[in-house]
Regions:
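Accessory nucleic acid-recognition modules appended to NTPase machines
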Residues: 183-343
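Short glycine-rich substrate-engagement loop in P-loop NTPases that contacts/grips substrate
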Residues: 54-84
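Hydrophobic positions on the alpha1 helix immediately C-terminal to the Walker A/P-loop
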Residues: 34, 38
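Interdomain motor-coupling "hinge/lid" segment immediately C-terminal to the ATP-binding subdomain
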Residues: 121, 126-230
């Protein structure tokens, strides 16, 4: 089991506190394993496993606990038979209707430490925010980074050079369970295809009561094909009209929002760096795991420049950056990244194969006058840094702990 220390280091300060620890992220990205890691650390610190109550609400053994009242009664009964603090671990809690009422009740009436996971971003909206009133901390969990993938893939192919490992990562992506399949091509594709279908059906169609599944599938296919490129709901509506599917831009935006809430896609807004304002249209979208894109739709190597962008974007999120696409005049910077008052700029390219490409990628920073770090990241093996702008091979960039 990989330790996922980047997440554990953030969660650890809150272990044992009254704050509810909420872990969200796309289905099967490793949230359940984090619950196990937390239990391991608690046990190592002297807490008896007899004080743990763990429930995975997708397990049929707990199908009778699908309402707040049923869950409340079960936990109160079990906690009454236990001594000392109770540690509650609820996996995929969105399956329980009105679950937030339970969590708040436990927090108030029990001496407990609560951890919950869910596969939808709306887990923390509306009702929960009202009931908990700021008494929770959220951790968004992502599929494996290249560094995490490398650690596990090397257990399967210990002598594989890092270049070959990265080629595998470009196609396989970072879903943790692939390690159990030893990253074999056909089983991995089947698993990712089935996972995609599960996210689409359970977390998007079923949750949002979507009737026009064909329309949803067309929108998802379009967004995935256009990962990392700017487009508007209006342009997508025109495309669908060409396929004899007339649909309002508002409907398209709703369907894309449902996909983002299920963590299938991430939206990146565009920012005018000179006017210091967020632009209202033509956002970019990236997929939660590029391996899903390859398994379901193919084309990762054909669209490698976009896939490299996708990989870098997810790595920026993992490290806690808020990310926008930057515009300065007629130039665009792939990622403008902010965290605790610090800023970082990242430009992603496939290969700097010509002077024209070099000029375009490095020239994106011509209008940026501050002294924050600026990177151009590509697959090139040799360093082409210039004018204070750092050039890095993408593998080295992803494996570097400190970019500042």
């Amino acid at each position: 089991m990989i330790k996922r220390e980047r997440y554990m280091s953030r969660i650890r300060p809150f272990i044992g506190t009254e704050l509810v620890k909420v872990m969200t992220g796309i289905r099967r990205c490793g949230k359940s394993v984090l619950l196990e890691l937390i239990q391991q650390e608690l046990t190592q610190s002297g807490v008896s496993p007899a004080q743990f109550i763990s429930i995975n609400f997708e397990d049929m053994r707990y199908s009778h606990l699908q309402t707040a009242q049923a869950l409340h009664d079960e936990i109160i009964k079990r906690a009454a038979a236990m001594e000392g603090k109770v540690y509650l671990f609820f996996d995929e809690i969105q399956e329980v209707r009105d679950w937030e009422k339970c969590v708040n009740s436990f927090r108030v009436s029990l001496d407990c430490d609560i951890y919950v996971t869910g596969s939808n971003a709306t887990l923390l909206s509306g009702e929960l925010a009202t009931y908990l009133g700021g008494r929770y901390v959220e951790f968004v969990i992502y599929p494996f980074s290249f560094g995490e993938f490398l650690e596990l893939y090397r257990s399967v192919e210990p002598d594989e050079p890092v270049q070959k490992c990265f080629q595998k990562y470009l196609l396989a992506g970072g879903m943790p369970y692939l390690a159990n399949l030893r990253y074999a091509d056909a089983p991995s594709r089947q698993y990712l295809h089935d996972l995609f279908n599960s996210v689409q059906l359970k977390d998007i169609v079923k949750r949002n009561k979507i009737r026009d599944v064909d329309l949803l599938e067309r929108i998802i296919a379009y967004v995935i094909a256009n990962v990392g490129t700017t487009f508007s709901a209006t342009s997508l509506a025109k495309f669908l009209k060409s396929e004899q599917r007339a649909v309002a831009p508002e409907t398209i935006l709703n369907y894309i929002r449902y996909c983002c809430e299920a963590y299938l896609f991430y939206q990146v807004r565009r920012e005018d760096l000179q006017g210091k304002q967020i632009l209202a249209s033509n956002e970019k979208y990236y997929i939660a795991d590029h391996g899903i894109r390859e398994a379901v739709f193919g084309g990762n190597m054909r669209d490698i420049n976009l896939i490299l962008e996708n990989i870098v974007y997810l790595e920026l999120l993992r490290r806690g950056y808020e990310v926008t696409v930057g515009r300065t005049g007629d130039k665009e910077i792939d990622f403008v990244c902010g965290k605790r008052g610090e800023k970082l700029y990242v430009q992603v390219a496939y290969l700097l194969a010509s002077e024209e490409t070099v000029s375009r990628e490095f020239g994106a920073y011509d209008n940026i006058r501050d002294n924050f770090p600026k990177y151009v990241v590509s697959l090139d093996e040799f360093d082409m840094s210039r004018n204070g702008i750092k050039h890095r091979n993408i593998r080295d960039f992803l494996l570097t702990e400190d970019w500042t």
